[in-house]
């Protein structure tokens, strides 16, 4: 049985393996560790424990543990001779009955930055293929004449997906000259001839590469094009061949009348009726150009999902999950150079390099730390670890959400994938 353990001063892979009945090799593999490197105080590890024993960690509650292991709260309390309101103590041993995993769908986005695609990125894609329902290739860019600008090596990526019984997604964006374009979108939405040509080209491309989900990530669309975008999606839906699905990306909203160009065009209720599923970008509260904070704090994410559920069936919702963190220089000032994107593995390596402990914000459910670099500049880092993604998995269970969508491949986070299949059964449709 897998459990999450927070490293304390003096802990090592060997001492943790001995304490929890695991092996050093298992801990190293599951957490993507280098056996020669020391552990970081505050680092979260996943450990395969002996039998069905669980050892209470900081921040635990019976409810949280019952969610994590898919066991009814009352059953967990009864088998351990506890009341539902029992106070748990760090280190306390509990017995965890066998739970039942729910089936969900999963997506991961691939966004190559080089031509040809780096072999390391190709290998990373192959490695996580078993954990995916869909592989989203970002992106096919819409053009004003109704054609598509293809990303590099599309056939290769589509083949990798299908070889793993994963559905390749045709991700179409309104990106023009590197930015999402409202003007480009208006051309396509308002000209029937161009729109029909555009849809025809999309369907031909999807058939060519075996991409059985058509996905639109249209952002920064003019508010006055809201209804035109809904009509366009209905038009696409009516032309889809049998066996194909339609999906969209949505910005994170908490109400129908939320103002701002990023929010007004995305009509949750209409899209929930039209498309087969939606991907909600429940991340970037902490973003590169803003002050340091958790990228996907649990409270705001929950608020978005609750609103989404009021507008569409929860099984149509794919919760967005970042695989990245950010490293900000302090003090933060508007106009500073953007924060540096960083993987979970790289974040822990930074904490180790500068010999600083990792702290955990239980309100946001996110790890973070501060350090001073060689030039005396202070930094603040927020990222994801096994605790933070487990809190999101628990939220998915609580809200009955249909799946999860990861941005993006190439940012190592081995703990996530192991925990994903410990929590859920991943639906395969390929």
Swiss-Prot record:
CDD domains tied to this protein: GH18_CFLE_spore_hydrolase, LysM
Gene inactivation effect: The inactivation of the gene does not affect vegetative growth, spore viability, or the initial stages of germination, including dipicolinic acid release. However, germination of mutant spores is slightly delayed and mutants retain more diaminopimelic acid and N-acetylmuramic acid during germination than wild-type spores.
Record's keyword annotation contains Hydrolase: yes
Principal localisation: other
Pfam families: Glyco_hydro_18, LysM
Induction (UniProt): Expressed during sporulation.
One of the record's GO molecular function terms: chitin binding
Protein name, UniProt field: Cortical fragment-lytic enzyme
Source organism of the structure: Bacillus anthracis
Upper lineage: Bacteria, Bacillati, Bacillota, Bacilli, Bacillales
């Amino acid at each position: 049985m897998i459990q999450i353990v927070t490293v304390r001063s003096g802990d090592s892979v060997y001492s943790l393996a001995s304490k929890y009945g695991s092996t050093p090799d298992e801990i190293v593999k599951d957490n993507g560790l280098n056996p020669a490197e020391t552990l970081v105080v505050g680092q979260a590890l996943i450990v395969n424990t002996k039998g069905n024993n669980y050892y209470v960690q900081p921040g635990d509650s019976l409810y949280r543990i019952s969610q994590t292991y898919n066991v009814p709260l009352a059953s967990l309390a009864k088998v351990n001779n506890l009341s539902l309101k029992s106070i748990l103590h760090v280190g306390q041993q509990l017995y965890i009955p066998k739970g039942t995993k729910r089936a969900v769908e999963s997506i991961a986005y691939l966004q190559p930055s080089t031509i040809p695609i780096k072999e390391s990125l190709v290998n990373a894609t192959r490695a996580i293929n078993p954990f995916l329902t869909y592989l989203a290739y970002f992106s096919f860019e819409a053009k004003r004449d109704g054609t598509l600008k293809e990303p590099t090596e599309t056939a290769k990526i589509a083949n990798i997906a299908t070889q793993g019984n994963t559905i390749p997604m045709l991700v179409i964006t309104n990106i023009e000259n590197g930015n999402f374009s409202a003007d480009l979108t208006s051309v396509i939405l308002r000209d029937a001839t161009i729109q029909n040509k555009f849809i025809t080209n999309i369907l031909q491309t999807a058939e060519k590469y075996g991409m059985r989900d058509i996905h639109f990530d249209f952002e920064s669309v003019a508010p006055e094009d809201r209804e035109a975008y809904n009509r366009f999606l209905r038009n696409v839906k009516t032309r889809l061949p049998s066996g194909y699905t339609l999906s969209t990306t949505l910005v994170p909203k908490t109400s129908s009348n939320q103002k701002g160009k990023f929010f007004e065009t995305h009509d949750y209720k209409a899209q929930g009726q039209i498309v087969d599923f939606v991907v909600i970008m429940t991340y970037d509260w902490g973003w590169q150009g803003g002050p340091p904070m958790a990228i996907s704090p649990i409270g705001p994410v929950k608020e978005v999902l609750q609103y989404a559920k009021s507008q569409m069936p929860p099984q149509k919702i794919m919760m967005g999950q970042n695989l990245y963190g950010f490293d900000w220089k302090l003090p933060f000032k508007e106009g500073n150079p953007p924060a540096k994107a960083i993987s979970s593995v790289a974040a822990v390596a930074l904490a180790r390099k500068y010999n600083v402990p990792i702290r955990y914000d239980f309100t946001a459910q996110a790890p973070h730390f501060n350090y001073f670099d060689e030039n005396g500049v202070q930094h603040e880092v927020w990222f994801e670890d096994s605790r933070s993604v487990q809190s999101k998995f628990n939220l998915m269970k609580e809200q009955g959400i249909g799946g999860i969508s990861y941005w993006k491949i190439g940012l190592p986070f081995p703990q996530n994938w192991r925990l994903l299949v410990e929590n859920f059964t991943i639906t395969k449709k390929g």
